[in-house]
From Swiss-Prot:
Source superkingdom: Bacteria
A family per Pfam: OSCP
Keywords: ATP synthesis, Cell membrane, CF(1), Hydrogen ion transport, Ion transport, Membrane, Transport
GO molecular function per UniProt: proton-transporting ATP synthase activity, rotational mechanism
Membrane-protein topology: Peripheral membrane protein
Principal location listed in the UniProt entry: membrane
Stated role: F(1)F(0) ATP synthase produces ATP from ADP in the presence of a proton or sodium gradient. F-type ATPases consist of two structural domains, F(1) containing the extramembraneous catalytic core and F(0) containing the membrane proton channel, linked together by a central stalk and a peripheral stalk. During catalysis, ATP synthesis in the catalytic domain of F(1) is coupled via a rotary mechanism of the central stalk subunits to proton translocation. This protein is part of the stalk that links CF(0) to CF(1). It either transmits conformational changes from CF(0) to CF(1) or is implicated in proton conduction.
UniProt-annotated location(s): Cell membrane
Name of this chain's protein: ATP synthase subunit delta
Family affiliation: Belongs to the ATPase delta chain family.
Length: 180
């Protein structure tokens, strides 16, 4: 029931964005909102609290978000708060972003490396895979201390690996096959 509600709110926002021909704008705003929400767990708790009056929650929302988001995004957030669903905001935003990214032909990938990669390298990898997959690819760099050197890239459930760790695995596999 709750997940259907979440999907319903996400779909409603998606339909409004589509009708207004502003899906890209809404997508960027919701991405920014999602980052803010994920970085401020206390805000989610505050705006989800049943002990704080609705008027106070709406005032908090207004003070924080009014100058940063369009009227429709702010109204959407007010509706979520008014219906006591802010505890599910992360799920609602994720569903919207998933639906919108499919419509906008955007894929997400993860670059695992032993150390933080330079933004230029990430940008070059995004461009390379965007061209290869014929869609926009946005990547997040994650640190994996088990990698000795090299990178592992995951996009759309496909793994592209060029690392010493993987090379050692392949060598072991090859040796074992030759022994049989």
């Amino acid at each position: 029931m709750i997940s259907q509600n979440n999907k319903g709110y996400a779909l409603a926002l998606f339909e409004i964005a589509n009708e207004e021909l502003k899906l890209e704008q809404y997508f960027q705003e919701v991405k920014k909102l999602n980052e803010i929400i994920n970085e401020n767990e206390d805000l989610v708790k505050l705006l989800s609290s049943k002990e704080i009056q609705l008027e106070k929650k709406l005032k908090i929302l207004e003070n924080i978000f009014t100058n940063h988001f369009t009227v429709n995004i702010n109204n959407f957030l007010k509706l979520i708060i008014t219906n006591n669903l802010f505890i599910y905001i992360k799920s609602i935003l994720k569903i919207f972003l998933d639906i919108a990214s499919k419509k906008l032909n955007i894929s997400y990938g993860k670059i695992y490396s032993s150390k933080k990669l330079d933004e230029k390298i990430i940008s070059n990898l995004e461009k390379f895979y965007s061209d290869k997959l014929s869609k926009k690819v946005e990547m997040l760099n994650l640190i994996d201390t088990t990698l000795i050197k090299g990178i592992r890239i995951e996009i759309e459930n496909t793994i592209h690996e060029n690392s010493i760790k993987n090379n050692i695995k392949e060598l072991q596999k090859s040796i074992l096959e030759k022994e049989q």
